[in-house]
Amino acid sequence: MAHLVSEEYLSRENIDQYFETLADKIIETGIGHHKILVVGGAAMALKYQDGRSTVDIDICFREQNNLYSCCQSVAAEYGLPDDWINADVMHSDSFSYALFEKAVLYKEYRNILEIYLADDLDLYCMKLVSFRPKDIQDMEVLASDLRKNGITKETVIENFVRLYGNEYLLRNDDRKIIFMENQLRI
């Protein structure tokens, strides 16, 4: 889906501020406790303190429970585009419910909003599926940490199968395998 804005305006600092406000809106509306998994560029911005920014926050959740009305309130308060936070990724090839299994708690806001980040290896696999220029840049950053942790091509393939059930989305483009092999060489 095309975004309402093309400028990357969401950074670690304002993402934290918006999540804090979102927690306040959740409390105000009384919709209960929420757990959100952040993936994509926003996960990279929150994980790596390299000044990364993004055009939106890609989220995954198991229960929506009127969360979007709170998100729209945050958008109105800060003058953000309606799609500043969205779950479009849940309708993409790179999504898998297995992403929740290894997610890491980033922060809890106001004891009502838990924000999780996709595990580095899962994020790497997601970016292998998408394989856009901005994903390739993120994969460079992720590969450095994965190499340090002894992650090999075989480990990536095993994790890929855990997420997607088979290797089809990896093997559908030979460039992905070659790229991954080159990145994970020690």
Describe the function of each predicted region.
Residues 1-38, 42-186:
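Compositionally biased terminal segments of proteins
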